[in-house]
Amino acid sequence: MTASATIPKTQYAVQLVGPSELRVNPEKEVFQPGPHQILAKVEAVGLCFSDLKLLKQFKDHARKSEVMKGLSAEILASIPSYVPGEKPTVPGHEVVCRIVAIGDQVKQHTVGERVLVQTDYRNLPTAGSNSAFGYNFEGALQEYVLMDERVVVDASGERFLIPPIVERLPDGA
């Protein structure tokens, strides 16, 4: 693992522990990155309507359910930020953060890099939707967040997934 300055062992985090039940955890563990994982310090996080839906629905939200395919149960068990079903999660999927540690197999990102997160994990379907950062994988309402290297993009936005406009929009649209 490659890391920057001292990383604390615990942090403050907002955790969703049940329907309409948010708690501030002043001693949530700061996870160390595995081989293909990144640990980043959160610089900014936004909340939106989908966070409110998760707050109300909790385990019944389609993106809070278990991954059906794309990763083996063994790999999922090795990811401490994978929290499907009734496990508490950390909401917050709109985030800018700075990488503070990387796993030894991470090749496309470096410590100190500022990144955005691609929320939707389309290659990890659940029973009713797709897995997502801030749902069945912990989000960014915490000081440090652990992520797979494939879900971050550099903050310039040049590699972010923005759908192309294929038709000219009518005037006044």
Regions found by a protein language model. Give the residues of each.
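Glycine-rich beta-strand-centered segment in the early N-terminal region that forms part
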Residues: 31-45, 60-121, 138
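Short N-terminal binding/cap micro-motifs at the start of the first secondary-structure element
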Residues: 20-25, 49-51
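Conserved hydrophobic/aromatic beta-strand scaffold that supports enzyme active sites
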Residues: 24, 39, 96-98, 144-146, ...
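NAD(P)H dinucleotide-binding glycine-rich loop of Rossmann-like/cofactor-binding domains
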Residues: 75-86, 118-173
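Cytochrome P450 core scaffold surrounding the K-helix E-X-X-R motif
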Residues: 50-55, 126
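Eukaryotic N-terminal low-complexity, Ser/Thr- and Lys/Arg-rich leader segments
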Residues: 1-12
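Residue-level recognition of beta-strand termini and adjacent short loop/turns
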Residues: 18-20, 34
